[in-house]
Amino acid sequence: MTAQTDSWADATIASLQAKGHRNSGARRAVVELLGRQDCCLTAQEIFDQLRAEGRRVGIASVYRVLEQLSKDGFVQRIDIGAGTTRFEPIHAGGEHHHHLVCDDCGKVEAFADDQLERALQKVEGRTGYSVAGHDVVLRGACRDCAPAR
């Protein structure tokens, strides 16, 4: 783990405790796993990875923890279509990125683009909206699946 992921997990646990939430094994397991990720995961993927690590966490607990983390602003919910929601940590001052989703194999990749960010900021200026945040999900076929189309 990097210092940033360690500090995110530690800060998240400390903040939740300060709000009166118990430091349950499920909560700690989900937070630690999310802190190690480069991109977003579904609740099922989180559950599967925790079980593979030998953590005894129920799927309902994973959903409850993710809901609380989302409500408290520690994770971002990302709707990638087809009724699938993914979750990833929100790092204070960290890298902002968007997502590419392959409609064929389901692969999700993160990407950042300074020109896209500038274009989105211009929209804020033109419309007069005070934009609190945004997420861009681009759908299509990944490098592996595109040749088969």
Annotated model-derived regions:
Residues 45-51, 62:
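A short acidic, leucine-rich amphipathic alpha-helix
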Residues 9, 26-27:
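Short, leucine-enriched amphipathic alpha-helices that occur as contiguous helical runs
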Residues 62-72:
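Basic amphipathic alpha-helical segments that dock to polyanions
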Residues 25, 36-42:
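Short capping segments at the starts of secondary-structure elements
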Residues 28-33:
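Pre-recognition alpha-helix immediately N-terminal to the DNA-recognition helix
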Residues 8-20:
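Short, Lys/Arg-enriched N-terminal segment that forms or immediately precedes the first helix
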Residues 71-149:
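Non-DNA-binding regulatory cores of transcription-related proteins
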